[in-house]
Amino acid sequence: MSTWGFASPTPDRFAVSAEAEDKVREQQTRLERIFNVGMSVLSKDCPENPHIWLQLEGPKENVCRAKEYLKGLCSPELQSEIHYPPRLHCIFLGAHGFFLDCLAWSTSAHLVPLLPGSLMISGLTEAFVMAQSRVEELVQRLSWDLQLQSCPGAPDNGGVLRDFSALLQTREDAYTEALLRLPLAVQEELLSLVQEASRGQGPSREVGSSGLLSPQFQGVRAPLNEGREFVGTRVAGSGKSPAVRGQSHTVEKEERKQDAVRDMGSGRKELSGEEVWEPGVAYRSQLAGGGAEEVAPLKGKASGKQEVPQQRGGFSVQGEPSGAHVPCQRAAPIRGASLLQRLHNGSASPPRVPSPPPAPEPPWPCGDRDRDRDRGDRGDKQQAGARGRGSPWKRGTRGGNLVTGTQRFQEALQDPFTLCLANVPGQPDLRHIVIDGSNVAMVHGLQHYFSSRGIALAVQYFWDRGHRDITVFVPQWRFSKDSKVRESHFLQKLYSLSLLSLTPSRVMDGKRISSYDDRFMVKLAEETDGIIVSNDQFRDLAEESDKWMAIIRERLLPFTFVGNLFMVPDDPLGRNGPTLDEFLKKPVRKQGSSKTQQPSKGSTEQANQQQGKDADRSNGGIRKTRETERLRRQLLEVFWGQDHKVDFILQREPYCRDINQLSEALLSLNF
């Protein structure tokens, strides 16, 4: 199959049940579009063979994803109908199914939209769980507080709105306006989904406009729904190739300027500060003509805004001379490194696209803050006598240059980093380091990605200080395919060096069941007299025993990241506490004057137990009923079905509150 535009490696052949042949043939076109592979059903050697052979050709990653998709389609391990707010239904049907294709590429699950608010998911266990998690993430983002995000002072509004609107330009359909009305948090997650697909060779190649993709992705065949097709950079239906459009660019530009001036001078609706933008009207498709259409007049009214006068012909804004505006402000260049510019790490910047409308002016205090900021900005750019609020188009253009957290994280990953642990002896007087891998990875990933590089940076830091006893705890399911994990090869290397330990987890009925990894960390710190590296406070574990409370209070080391720089405080316990070097060293134990007088191991353990009992009696006396019930529940979680033994130990040790000592006492019983 040579129609896919890339050199195909050795074809991958595998067998599936013959009963699923009809399903496979029905999904063949969609599978080839989503995963950008070629698929063929090989002829049967024997008509009675219960299996059929399928052949996939394409890039290795695409073939692996498509193979997992087909296996889940033919023999699904999990299948369920999930429900979500109907407002999100436009995601799965809008943009000609583009976001649904990106979700299928990311998870390799078979997705079928049903009635508004329901989605059928089927596939292998891992694919099903990933798809369910992505939908839950969209639902969670929909419930976020959106009032602050509508403020023009919010840092990411302009970039996210502009990129999302530009993404929909060549995919307009009946759901475009509903997509544009989604909260910015949901739009940002969809952009992240598209970016994830673009790192491979997934559905993001179906962009029909050359202005949204880098040159290396232009010229790729990209079929759309209902037979509509874009080939290369030529827009179907426009009748113009890029060369023709380039020759007529000057003429069209002059015509658009004249039309804009004529429209502004005609009897259009008065423009006032009370009016807000209608989302989705300002971004119309370029399929029909090749040039950006004019921005539609403003609709709707808000309360509490001062009216801005309009002057016929000259179109002046209050407080500014009529000559201060260009006749048409609808097309603004993209000056920042936006998310869509960097989708495929292209070397060339995209051409100009329409600038998004400004966000509606919020009530106090956002309005006053923006008004003060605009005065300061205009003081550097306009005449000294110019007062007032300034042009809303100019504010929208300036807001479009703001970066997003996802973009900043991707830029940080561009800097090369290699985990290099020198094979030299360490310092024996240093404490064991216990690293909260999930906490470190999420902090470095800006709470959005699981950054394996963050864990590697932390290990490198302590290794360079001379520590050799280092343990990183990470849930086992992070080793499986997870869209949020970045640079997982660092985890593989640390695991091969016995520096990383996996806490148990499993999947049951499509839900992930994980062990509480915080317990592993505190328990290991207790046994090794180690330091826990985490920004978590472990409040729920501090009440379980006095020893654990002392560990959490005295042996917890917080951290932070400045880009790719891992940093810890020089005074972990405050200004009056020990320095970092003293904090990381093992405590010095005083030895007796004669080694022959050292007690035996058995007598030492008995003395320690007796001291613990005496301490319990002196600290709190006999346990309260509530404490006993709590300890009984915790013990039964471990010693299931041994109610009589648990009750016996609790009655025999009325002063003990340490769950570990009670567990040891249970294990020592012989009946």
From Swiss-Prot:
InterPro entries: KH_N4BP1_1st, KH_N4BP1_2nd, RNase_Zc3h12_NYN, UBA_N4BP1_C, ZC3H12/N4BP1_RNase_Reg. Pfam families: KH_N4BP1_1st, KH_N4BP1_2nd, RNase_Zc3h12a, UBA_N4BP1_C. Residues 250-272, 367-381 have a biased composition (Basic and acidic residues). Residues 591-612 have a biased composition (Polar residues). It comes from the Eukaryota. Residues 351-365 have a biased composition (Pro residues). Residues 430-582 form the RNase NYN domain. The keyword S-adenosyl-L-methionine does not apply. The modification Phosphoserine is found at residue 355. Residues 234-274, 294-327, 344-402, 577-626 are annotated as: Disordered. Keywords: Phosphoprotein. Belongs to the N4BP1 family. This is Protein KHNYN. It comes from Mus musculus. The lineage of its organism: Eukaryota, Metazoa, Chordata, Craniata, Vertebrata.
